[in-house]
Amino acid sequence: MQTQEQIENLQAIQQDVEIVDLDSPFKIGGQEIKSVEVRKPSVIALRKVRIADILNGDVNSICTLLPLCTTNPTLTKQQLDTLVDPVDIIQMGSAIITFLQPKSVRAEIALQQ
C-alpha cells in the first residue's frame, strides 16, 4: 500500500495516466494482467466518439476509445469484448471520464480517494 505522499507524488508525475486495478484479472499470451494503465485520450482519439456518450457511460463508446487509451498492456477491441469483465470496462471508462474533467475537479476527486 502506498502512503498519501507517494500517491500525490505519483499523480504529480503522471497526471495523464491512471493505473486501474482489475477486479477480474485475465491472461494475454500466458501473462496474467492484473492492472491496466489508462492514459488521457488525445483529441484524435476523441474524434472517434461523441464526448457526451463517454460522459454518459456508453459502453460502445468506451470500448471504441479504450484501445486508443490503454497502455501496459494496450488492449484491442476484441480483447475488451472477450477477456475483460464488464466491471473493469466501467472502471477504465471512469478513468477516461475523470481525464475529461477540469484539473480543479480532478484535484477534488483525488483528495476524496
Predicted regions, residues:
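Short, surface-exposed, charged amphipathic helix/loop patches that serve as local interaction elements
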Residues: 2-113
